[in-house]
Design a protein with these regions (language model features):
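Vicinal oxygen chelate
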Residues: 2-30, 41, 47-136, 146-166
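Conserved ATPase active-site switch/coordination loops adjacent to the nucleotide-binding site
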Residues: 139
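Short acidic-aromatic low-complexity motifs
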Residues: 33-37
Length: 166
């Protein structure tokens, strides 16, 4: 049976094949927030997200807003407590960190903070070769913002990690 994919903002569905076994597949995070409409606006202002599609339901909540951030997709959904679908504030935090790799980490970091993100870890030149920092968005999701600066051999990264966490 073919899978269905939502295409663009026109909600047209078309068949597509599942990725062949052994082929690279992509993961699209589907995060839960309190206020998907507000979250979509925040992600637009913070990260330049563009809305691809949305699925509202009759009670006014949004089952999904699909956003494009750079080359990736992010789905947002309002909370559905009756189904156990809860946002970070409802569960006391988040066990997941979203990673956003960018060309200019300083600019993206500043833009996200201006939009309302809170700094959890300031940008710093890290031992694995990235300019890296962490933000928490107003909806309780954490974001690692990284800019690759230089390639470092894995054995050197492992040794540096051992020193950093000793």
């Amino acid at each position: 049976m073919p899978h269905l994919a939502m295409l663009g903002g026109n909600n047209v569905q078309a068949p597509r094949s599942p990725a062949p076994y052994g082929r690279l597949m992509s993961i699209t995070p589907h995060i839960v927030v309190r206020g998907a409409e507000r979250a979509a606006a925040f992600y637009r202002d913070a990260f330049g997200a563009e809305e691809v599609s949305r699925i509202p339901i009759p009670d006014g909540r949004l089952m999904s807003i699909q956003l494009r951030i750079g080359d990736g997709l992010l789905h947002l959904a309002d909370e559905f407590p009756e189904m156990g679908v809860l946002a970070p504030p409802s569960i006391g935090g988040t066990p997941v960190v979203l990673a956003l790799n960018v060309v200019d980490a300083e600019a993206v970091f500043a833009q996200a903070v201006t939009a309302g993100a809170e700094i959890r870890q300031p940008l710093a030149d890290m031992f694995w070769g990235d300019l890296h920092g962490q933000l928490e968005d107003p909806f309780g999701h954490r974001w690692n913002i990284s800019q690759h600066l230089r390639d470092i051999p894995n054995d050197e990264v492992v040794a540096a990690a051992a020193r950093a966490f000793a």
